[in-house]
Amino acid sequence: MAIRSKTKYPKEKKRMNAIKSFFKWISRFTILFFLFTVLFIVGSMALTGVMPVNTTSEPGLVSETSGLLAIVLANVFVISALILTSRWGGWKLAIGIALAYYGAVTFVMQIETWYFLSSITVSSQLLLRLFLMGIPTAFLFVPLAVWVLGKSRYTADTSSNSALIMPVQQWVWKLSGVSVVYLGLYWGAGYFIAWQNPELRAFYGQPGESLPFFIHTAKTILHDPALFPFQILRALIWVLCALPIIRGSKVNPWWTALLVGMFFSVPQNIGHILANPLLPIASVRLSHMIETAASTFIFGAIVVWLLHREHKTVKDLLGLSQP
């Protein structure tokens, strides 16, 4: 009997520890859910009184309540994943993730809002408020999430970390490659997914049949020569937002690529499931959601592939030789 009780006790203790751990994580995510909801609503209050009043939006894919639930869950999941997979801790982690989150979720998206919608549905006053809207979730929620998830203490990392360490020449050609890749994904997804929607073409002032791809591209370069340089700038901002994630990641490059892909695609596009007077046509929102979620996810994964370490040769880059 004594032997049985000795072998049984560790199993019971392990089971109890597992139950305690489960409820601890449930309580943590419940707290994070509540905090993000409150701060998201606080940020949204910046738009009070400046949204278009003469534009009626078509209904979203889901109700406002369900949409808010989805937005909160998606953002909490992505931010928590970035925090928990980082080798960093304390303010280094909080500031790094906060800046990356604001840059990728608010800044890089709203400069595109300025470029395309400032002459359609977005006033200069509203544009400023859109930039302010993202501040609470980035610079208040992220540090709080670091604390709630138990990463508030700085821990010195003595393990080797080759992420982002490469010669200047390699940085130059990789950033050039990243820019070309982003232009290809942006323009390809934009034309073959979003631009095939006649309601979207009409919304942006080009009703009727779509032009063939190369004619459409040439016409865009002729009439809007700033578009491609502007998108190259956005590509570099995307990369800047990915650097703290790549450098701080303690998981393997495949998982890091998945995380950055989700980070680039989920928080920015989940809002398209709701009604939106800035994009009042439901099919336009859906087209943009599919277009940008697909292209930015792929782009995020490629950024990690190119930048996570130095590559000695093209074979090394393609995984055909040992690093």
Mark where each language-model region is.
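N-terminal amphipathic/basic-hydrophobic helices that include classical n-h-c signal peptides
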Residues: 1-15
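Juxtamembrane/disordered regions of integral membrane proteins
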Residues: 12-321
